[in-house]
Amino acid sequence: MRSTGRRRRRPPERRRVAVKDPQTIHLAHSPDADDAFMFWALAAGRIDTGDRRYVHELGDIESLNRRALAGELEVTAVSLHAYAYLADRYALLAHGASIGDRYGPRIVARAARPADPRAALGAGSLLVAVPGELTTAFLALKLYQPAARHVVVPFDQIEEYVVAGHADAGLLIHEGQLTYADRGLHLWVDLGEWWHDETGLPLPLGGNVVRRDLGDALMRDIARDLKASIQYGLAHRAEALAHATAYGRGLDPSRIDRFVGMYVNAYTVDYGPTGRQAVAELLARAQRAGLLPGPVQVTFVAG
């Protein structure tokens, strides 16, 4: 066969497009209806997170506080009390706060409310079941009555612990704030209401922190993702509530709706000036009362 002298053309080479490996970020929060609501869009892939992939971990807040102290988690929910011991390693995300505006952790008891609950709790004869010594609820209790005696009990067992007579009173967080009367317990003090009477400010209870070694750019990206998740949940409330119901620990839908409404609010989208002032005031008062080792420099990262 004779050659035509023509060279066969090579097919054009396909350009290889570099695909950035997804960055895996471990994000931890408590298995509660309010956290489930705010993280739903992120967990369900409803928002664009670019090359960031989130792995969700669940744990009770005291366990998360302890893990954050060890630096184990890149992003996690923590108590604002615990943040006082984390500020050198973690920054506080400006989004995802649990802030009670004239309501918060509640001190309940089998006995009816005395004329002076503060004096009764400080007399030394009563034992209060608390959900953890790093919780903000515990810090608020100690600001209210430093002499209160306490025993640490898992947060979801406190009501039963008090009903059974193992403690005289219980410090309730999460959904227990709505269910104590079902067990015949009596409200002695709402610490969020007390705090507002004292300061005129809401009570900041929990927030989300990000480890500083991730770098400024990634911390801001994470903050944007979290803010977008909260805003998406608020814009699609019915769907987010349906997801949160699975974490309601037996609460009926109306109570889940009420609880989420209490702790997923405007402060959750962003602390804002009032929320930031409340954090500073809480930590400053705790430091002056000798409940913290020293002043706390709070760094907020916003998206």
Per-region residue spans from a language model:
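Beta->alpha turn/N-cap motifs
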Residues: D60-E62, G71-A84, P154-F155, L172-L178
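A structural signal for short loop-to-beta-strand junctions that line the ligand-binding cleft
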Residues: I25-H26, R89-A97
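A short beta-strand-loop structural module common to alpha/beta enzyme folds
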Residues: D48-S63
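Bilobed "Venus flytrap"/periplasmic-binding protein-like clamshell domains
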Residues: P22-A44, L58, P105-A169, E175, ...
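Pocket-lining segment of extracytoplasmic ligand-binding domains
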Residues: D156-A246
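Secondary-structure end/capping motifs
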Residues: G215-R285
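Compositionally biased, low-complexity flexible segments
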Residues: M1-R16
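Periplasmic-binding protein-like
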Residues: G100-R106, D182-R212, R258, A266, ...
